[in-house]
Structure formats: C-alpha cells, structure tokens
Design a protein with these regions (language model features):
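Conserved catalytic motifs of ABC-family nucleotide-binding domains
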Residues: 302
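Short strand-turn-strand beta-turns centered on an Asx-Gly dipeptide
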Residues: 308-313, 339
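Serine-dependent protease modules
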Residues: 22-281, 286-290, 295-297, 316-320, ...
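C-terminal motif of bacterial Sec signal peptides marking the signal peptidase cleavage site
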Residues: 18-20
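Bacterial N-terminal signal peptides that target proteins for export
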Residues: 1-9
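Edge beta-strands of extracellular beta-sandwich domains
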Residues: 345-347
C-alpha cells in the first residue's frame, strides 16, 4: 500500500512540475514588452488629448439612438404576411422637453419609433415633421429636463477646423470620430439646389445618420447625413440651414419651399457678347414655365437676374437659395438686365411642389 501511495505521489509530481515551470516570473515578463512611462506625450499633446476627451464626455448625454420599424412587403408569390423592416439611426436633443433632430431617411414612413437616451431610458417617439429634400426630421418624445446640444453658426466655420462626429454606428453604442472640415461648398442635393453640405473626413458610418457634427466649442455645426461609399468622406447639413427649417417642421410638419418656375444657367462668355453684358455676372433665364410665378411676373427668356429684394445674384445657386427660403406669397422685386438695359419687375413667390415637368417657354 505504501509503495502504491509513493508511486501516485511521484506521478503527480511529474505532471505538476512542467505546469509550475510554465508560469513566467516577473523577470521573464519584463523581457516580453517595455512598460511605457506614465506620460510619454508632449505636454501640449496631452492637454489637447484631454480637451477632446472632456468635450466628448460633455456631448454624449444629449446624443440618442433611434430605432425604427417600417411595414414590409411580402413576396409576390407568397401569401405569408410581410415581415417588418427595421433600421437604426442617431439623433440629438435640441429642446429639453424632448425635441430631437435626426435625418428624414431615418424615420421616413416609420410605423414605430423608439428613442434610447444616453442614460439607457427608452421612449416611444413620433415624427413631428420631415423634409426629404434636405434630409432633415424632427422627432418628439414625452420627457422633460433633458440635456441639449446648442446649434452654432455654420457660416463662421473654416476649412481645416477640427470637428467631432457623434452617433450610434451600426446600431451599436455611442461612438465619436475626429476629423476636420474638408470643404464648405459641397452641393447638397439636386432636389434642394442652392444649399451646401459640410464635407468632413470624420468617419460617418451607417447608423451615424442624424447625429451631430460638433466644433471644438461644443456647438453643433451640422447634422451628419451621408458618407461616400468608400467611407473616407462624410457630409453634414449645416446648422444654419437646420435653424432655418426647424420652425417650419415644428409648426407645419413640413417645409414650404419658394418657387419661381424658371430654368436658369450660368452666364458664359458667348452670352456676354450676345446679351451686351459688361461682365459674366448674374443668373441667365433660359426658359419660363407657363402660368408659374415668373411668367405671371413678366420674366422672359434671356433676362439676366442681378438682384432679388436687394440681395445680389452672382450665380444660379444664389437665386436658388434666396427663392427657396422666401415665404410663400411674398412679393419680391427682381432687378434684371434685358437687352442691355436695367429693369425691375415684381414677382410673387409660389410654392414648390413635386410636379410633372412642364413645357418651358423658349
């Protein structure tokens, strides 16, 4: 019996010996890597790093995650009920009683909206208003005393300024990406000409749509809207345009865009000679749609528009921007050149609506 016990103990010792040898000592560990000092960066970089991290911490409480359910479509050859379609996006709180900004494409045609706050609370949301032309929407939840993000002045930003893009990419937890303003004049959409996106290299991933683009002062200067397919370029709706549209979305549920009913173009060198112009400046009227505001106001093809209610018109996008944001029914003075002579006509701004293409008077 004693012999058997000694044999078992000897076997256990052989088994445990290599395991004991496999455990590295502190001396062995020290050879595998080098410990970094507590503060290896230059003081200026450490300070900047801390400022960014502190800024991100201040912004996060007003960031929200938006979940949406839409009606699905059943296969044509199948009688089974349609599966609902689900998607996610981001948003941020602009009013402490639960008013949230997001993208129109995030909540468009939603049957059900759920908003999750940074503290984990969940609320059912309802769409207050949206505009697909600019891709902007307002959602409201029944809550009060919420943290908000202030809207800054996007006209004051400069190319090269640092920005943070916040959101819930891929439906995950909050994320923050860092970059710069790459460009200020990126055309917004064909549907809403005259307005510009903010272009940034801060990553805007799927699910970040509707989140804020924030400057180093903690002010929202844009609403993240889309990214290029390769993901290296992102675009945001400027905050000044957001401030222009939010009152209409909140009160009417939609944006009423101004409309003239003209086709326009830039002035080319051949137009300068043909129309007896002093310079290639202004907006050339290529055609006038019959029965539309421009036609009723007396505008004609080959008119060169140079000012609207005193606002200079140097290029087509100037006219598009001014007309789009002028209240419906406003009577405006249009200064123009016709046959080399300066004239002034009055036009009443109409309402833009989706319409079939009308013939244009040449």
């Amino acid at each position: 019996m004693a012999v058997r016990v000694r044999a078992v103990l000897a076997l256990l010792a052989l088994v445990m010996f290599p395991l004991g040898c496999a455990r590295p000592t502190s001396a062995d560990q020290a050879k595998l890597w080098q410990e970094a000092p507590a503060s290896a960066a230059a003081p200026e970089l450490t300070r900047f790093n801390d400022l960014l991290a502190d800024l991100a911490d201040r912004l996060r409480p007003a960031l929200v995650h938006v979940r949406v359910r839409r009606a699905g479509s059943a296969p044509k050859d199948d009688d089974s009920p349609a599966e609902p379609r689900r998607s996610t996006g981001s948003g941020f709180i602009i009013e402490s009683n639960g008013l949230i900004v997001t993208n129109a494409h995030v909540v468009e045609q939603a049957e059900w909206i759920q908003v999750r706050l940074a503290d984990g609370r969940r609320f059912n949301g309802r769409t207050v208003g949206l505009d697909s032309r600019v891709d902007l929407a307002l959602v409201r939840i029944d809550a009060s005393g919420l943290p908000v993000l202030p809207l800054g002045d996007s006209n004051r930003m400069r190319v090269g300024e640092f920005v943070l893009a916040l959101g819930h990419p891929f439906g995950l937890e909050q994320s923050v990406s860092f970059g710069i303003v790459s460009r200020k004049g990126a055309p917004l959409t064909v549907a809403a000409p005259g307005f510009d996106f903010i272009q940034t290299d801060a990553a805007i991933n799927p699910g970040n749509s509707g989140g804020p683009l924030v400057n180093m002062a903690g002010q929202v200067i844009g609403v993240n809207s889309m990214a290029a397919r390769n993901g290296s370029i992102g675009f945001a709706i400027p905050s000044n345009l957001v401030k222009l549209l939010v009152p209409q979305l909140a009160s009417k549920g939609k944006v009423e865009w101004g409309w003239l009913g003209v086709s326009i173009a830039e002035i080319g060198d051949d137009d300068v000679d043909r129309l007896k112009l002093a310079e290639a400046k202004g907006v050339l009227v290529r055609g006038v749609m019959p029965g539309e505001p421009a036609d009723r106001g007396g505008l004609k093809p080959d008119d060169v528009l140079i000012a609207l209610d005193g606002t200079p018109l140097d290029a087509p996008r100037d006219l598009q921007r001014v007309v789009s944001t002028t209240p419906i029914g406003t009577r405006v003075r249009v200064m123009l050149l016709r046959g080399g002579e300066k004239k002034e006509v009055e036009v009443t701004i109409g309402r833009y609506k989706e319409r079939e293409e009308k013939p244009v008077a040449k």
